[in-house]
Design a protein with these regions (language model features):
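Well-ordered beta-strand positions in beta-sheet-rich domains
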Residues: 93-95, 106, 110, 133-135, ...
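A structural micro-motif recognizing beta-strand termini
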Residues: 99, 155-159
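Long C-terminal interaction/binding lobes of large macromolecular proteins
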Residues: 136, 154
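RNA pseudouridine synthases
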Residues: 1-127, 140-143, 147-148, 192, ...
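Pseudouridine synthases involved in rRNA/tRNA modification
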Residues: 1-14, 20-26, 130, 144-151, ...
């Protein structure tokens, strides 16, 4: 990890932070500093000890995925945000680089996702899995150059929220994400997946909120 998290949005009920690559959202028992630790320390520095204690992440990103992570700051409104997660009321868009030239312009990938029985780290497409939908739109097809293979720059909208959903769905289409060490080929650049934006109606104020995190890499 070589960058500090950045606050993108904050009010009395919600905080959005731009997570850098290499940082985990929740503790894994190793004592490694997490994005939740960062957010809690920031709230304490702002003099808001209650929020620092009550805060809960509303979404999670894999270690190498960058971008928007939302935190609920107030116990009284936490159930409203939890219900929004259940209802898929957050519109989430990701930017990603996929291997190869995708020959369609837009597609709804509708394939159930289950745990991989042969590798506990992985998920897989399988009939026994949970319903999973990912909408993919090709933004640009990048021709091979300077020794780099052909790649596709894509916008991805999550319609459900399964573990590794984007990675599994793109790999199932034979276009794994660039740098994916589980479902594709590991590369020094790391995983090219960025949680770019979140849009929703604020459950307390009724405002339409749109939050964006700048993409840390160029397609």
């Amino acid at each position: 990890m070589n960058e500090e998290p950045q606050v993108l949005y904050c009010d009395a009920w919600l905080m959005a932070i731009d997570k850098p690559a290499g940082m985990i959202v929740h503790g894994d028992g190793t004592g490694e500093r997490t994005l939740t630790d960062y957010a809690s320390d920031l709230l304490l520095a702002m003099g808001d000890g209650f929020a620092a204690t009550d805060m809960q992440p509303l979404n999670r990103l894999d270690r190498d995925t960058t971008g928007v992570v939302l935190f609920s700051l107030d116990k009284q409104t936490q159930p409203a945000f939890d219900q929004m997660v259940i209802d898929h009321a957050f519109e989430k868009h990701y930017l990603a680089l996929a291997e190869g030239k995708i020959d369609w312009n837009e597609k709804l990938i509708d394939k159930p996702i289950a745990r991989d029985r042969h590798d506990s780290r992985k998920m897989r497409v399988g009939a026994s899995g949970k319903p999973s939908q990912t909408r993919v739109k090709v933004l640009k097809r990048l021709k091979s150059r300077r020794g780099l293979p052909t790649r596709s720059y894509i916008d991805v909208e999550l319609l459900t929220g399964r573990k590794h959903q984007i990675r599994v769905h793109l790999a199932s289409e034979r276009h794994p994400l660039v740098g994916d060490d589980l479902y594709g080929t590991p590369l020094p650049c790391g995983l090219m997946l960025h949680a770019h934006s979140v849009s929703f109606t604020h459950p307390v104020t009724g405002e339409h909120i749109h939050i964006e995190a700048p993409c840390p890499w160029e397609p």
